[in-house]
Amino acid sequence: EDLQGDAVPEEXATKDDNEHPQTLLLTNVEFNXRPFVLIIYDRNTKSPLFVG
């Protein structure tokens, strides 16, 4: 089976951070059967905009 499609280049995260200066991106990635967690905090309100 070809699982290459599941790989995500690390450059993508840095690129997104640079393109969205208004938000602080905190990521926790575990590839041992654990889910991908992405939390975006608004710098002004200090509240989560998105958790997924």
Curated annotation (Swiss-Prot):
Plasma. One of its GO terms (molecular function) is serine-type endopeptidase inhibitor activity. It is found in: Secreted. This is Alpha-1-antiproteinase 3. Keywords: Acute phase, Glycoprotein, Protease inhibitor, Secreted, Serine protease inhibitor. The reactive center loop (RCL) extends out from the body of the protein and directs binding to the target protease. The protease cleaves the serpin at the reactive site within the RCL, establishing a covalent linkage between the serpin reactive site and the active site of the protease. The resulting inactive serpin-protease complex is highly stable. One of its GO terms (cellular component) is extracellular region. The keyword Transmembrane does not apply. Gene3D superfamilies: Serpins superfamily (2.10.310.10). It comes from the Eukaryota. The record marks 23-24 as: Reactive bond. The lineage of its organism: Eukaryota, Metazoa, Chordata, Craniata, Vertebrata. N-glycosylated; contains glycans with bi- and triantennary side chains. Its main location: secreted. GO terms for biological process: acute-phase response. The keyword Glycoprotein applies. Residues 1-20 are annotated as: Disordered. Belongs to the serpin family.
